[in-house]
From Swiss-Prot:
It comes from Mesorhizobium japonicum (strain LMG 29417 / CECT 9101 / MAFF 303099). NCBIfam families: acyl_carrier, PRK00982.1-2, PRK00982.1-3, PRK00982.1-4, PRK00982.1-5. It is found in: Cytoplasm. This is Acyl carrier protein AcpP. Residues 2-77 form the Carrier domain. Keywords: Cytoplasm, Fatty acid biosynthesis, Fatty acid metabolism, Lipid biosynthesis, Lipid metabolism, Phosphopantetheine, Phosphoprotein. The modification O-(pantetheine 4'-phosphoryl)serine is found at residue 37.
Amino acid sequence: MSDTAERVKKIVIEHLGVDADKVTEQASFIDDLGADSLDTVELVMAFEEEFGVEIPDDAAETILTVGDAVKYIDKASA
């Protein structure tokens, strides 16, 4: 798992209070990890702060899984 993936996983665990083994790259924030719309907004803000990237609303709407977040952050940080 990449450094970005590890950091995303840590943020998800802290914000959603889920078990680490549930946070896989395929895990959906809403369907698999029990996040609601407010949780997803808070996660995006936490990702922006942690990685120093800006995630516009239209992009945030496409980040549905842990893997989506990792891919977007890696691309935005490149």
